[in-house]
A protein has these predicted regions:
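Short strand-turn segments of transmembrane beta-barrel domains in outer membranes
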Residues: 197-201, 209-220, 225-259, 278-280, ...
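Periplasmic N-terminal accessory/gating domains of Gram-negative outer-membrane beta-barrel systems
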Residues: 78, 86-91, 112-219, 229-231, ...
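Membrane-embedded beta-strand positions in outer-membrane beta-barrel channels/transporters
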Residues: 57, 94-96, 164, 210, ...
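Face-selective signature of the C-terminal outer-membrane beta-barrel domain
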Residues: 306-324, 346-458
Length: 458
């Protein structure tokens, strides 16, 4: 009885503790990525407001957990509003905001912000949206591809539950994808080789700062896209403390961690930060309980490490990978339709990984940025069918494909008054191999081909 009384006394305090949280972030210059000291950050509809420190950081503490709009303003820069920032009691991601410089002086006018942002180079074909918009998008389920499919000019896949992106009537394999300036060949689980489409998204939304979709008139720095470009910009990890969150969904569970590395002083921001996440599905266990013959099983992992060498130089090491397996099991109850599905379904083993290292150098005059990156991506895909798919014995058909690409990119961006110039070069070394075996037709061949490609653009 005594324990119950104590619990009832302190229970309201426990509830209150779960209804408050903290929100931190960083404000940077859009051109040279320099921190903006003294920028004002206000939570709309409240009395909460802070000013950024010398490193551009701000912190709100003991804020009620709900959805807020943040307004960021700084003298000489355009005021920016971030909508629907969801504050949680634990694990709220760090916000990173880039402000655009404004050199024009105007009379007082009323501006209404469009929900989609565009650029001067491609004002009609480029759309930019933030991670907050992805998380709060109805029906998006924290899947970036599903949100992109609802954009103007984009058509979803018409063949099954797939995340294919079809731009203006093109093909799913005609778009390219970039993660912090590094090309990634795949953004979905169980992807079709040569196309990034698949049933489940691969990228962790909590890593993303913003996503830019170019459905036409894309910049020259992108390597020969036919239909469009989808560029993902990731945020930096928390430089002051360790943070993270655990997600438990209907089909999967995942954990995300972020924080400083090699931090020496308690009150100072670390020069090295990290972001890391891993996710595991448990669909195979659910399907086993439902007595279904299919067993999809997937893992994915993602990381990003930022290291600031000095005021003008920084290094970024990032990566993304997946482990996908699709197998079959014998159900307790058989009927002709289940038997036909088991005989026709393939056994899939797919492994993907992309890793890249980037060096970013800011010009000392503050009017540009040079980026040098080296990346590699590998894909292994084994597609098999057996006379007995349950025991995986007596192979009938097998296709073992392997891709390995290494890329080097150099990009220099300079700003002159209202002009922007982009100059760069790229180099790519690719190896593709294929081993196909078909017992029914007596086919068994092994092929391998290599390519070297380089280019210049301005």
């Amino acid at each position: 009885m005594k324990k119950r009384i104590i619990f009832l006394i302190f229970f309201p305090f426990f509830i209150y503790a779960q209804n408050i949280g903290s929100l931190d972030g960083r404000i940077l210059d859009d051109q040279d990525q320099q921190p903006l000291e003294g920028a004002t950050v206000i939570i709309e509809g409240t009395s909460f407001g802070v000013v950024t420190d010398e490193n551009g950081y701000f912190v709100f503490e003991n804020i009620p957990t709900k959805s807020y709009n943040l307004t960021i303003s700084f003298l000489g820069y355009r005021t920016k509003t971030i909508y629907n920032v969801i504050l949680k009691s634990f694990g709220t991601p760090t916000i990173q905001v880039l402000l655009e410089e404004s050199s024009d002086e105007l009379e007082e006018i009323i501006l209404v912000q469009s929900p989609f942002r565009t650029t001067r180079e491609t004002p009609l074909s480029t759309q930019t949206f933030s991670a907050v918009e992805i998380e709060t998008y109805p029906g998006g389920n924290n899947d970036i591809t599903k949100v992109v499919q609802s954009m103007p000019g984009i058509s979803p896949s018409i063949g099954g539950f797939r995340n294919d992106i079809i731009i203006r009537g093109g093909a799913p394999n005609e778009s390219v994808y970039y993660l912090d300036g590094i090309e990634i060949p795949n953004i979905n689980h169980f992807s079709t080789q040569g196309s990034a489409g698949g049933p489940l998204g691969l990228l962790n939304v909590s890593f993303i700062r913003e996503v830019t979709l170019s459905s036409s008139a894309f910049g020259a720095e992108y390597d020969n896209p036919l239909s469009g470009v989808l560029s993902f910009e990731q945020r930096e990890g928390n430089s002051k403390r360790l943070a993270g969150n655990f997600r438990f969904g209907a089909t999967e569970a995942g954990i995300t961690l972020e924080g400083p590395l090699f931090k020496k002083k308690e009150n100072k921001s670390a020069k090295t930060t990290f972001l890391f996440s891993v996710r595991r599905s448990y669909l195979q266990f659910l399907f086993e309980l439902l007595d279904l013959p299919i067993r999809p099983d997937y893992w994915d992992y993602q990381w990003k490490i930022n290291h600031k060498i000095n005021k003008y130089n920084s290094l970024i090491f990032l990566g993304l990978g997946s482990i996908d397996d699709f197998s079959l099991r014998s159900p307790k109850v058989f009927d002709p339709s289940i038997q036909a599905s088991i005989e026709q379904a393939p056994i899939i083993k797919q492994r993907t990984i992309t890793a890249g290292l980037s060096w970013k150098k800011k010009y000392k005059d503050g009017n540009g940025l040079m980026t040098t990156s080296v990346s590699t991506n590998r894909l292994g895909n084994i597609f098999s069918r057996f006379r007995d798919n349950i025991s995986q014995s007596n192979v009938v058909f097998e296709n073992d494909s392997y891709e390995w690409e290494t890329k080097i990119r150099l990009k220099s961006v300079r700003y002159f008054d209202n002009w922007k110039t982009v100059i760069g070069t790229n180099f790519q070394n690719s190896t593709y191999s294929n081993n196909t075996k078909n017992v029914l037709y007596g086919l068994n061949y092994n092929t391998k081909i290599k390519f070297l490609k380089f280019g210049l653009y301005a």
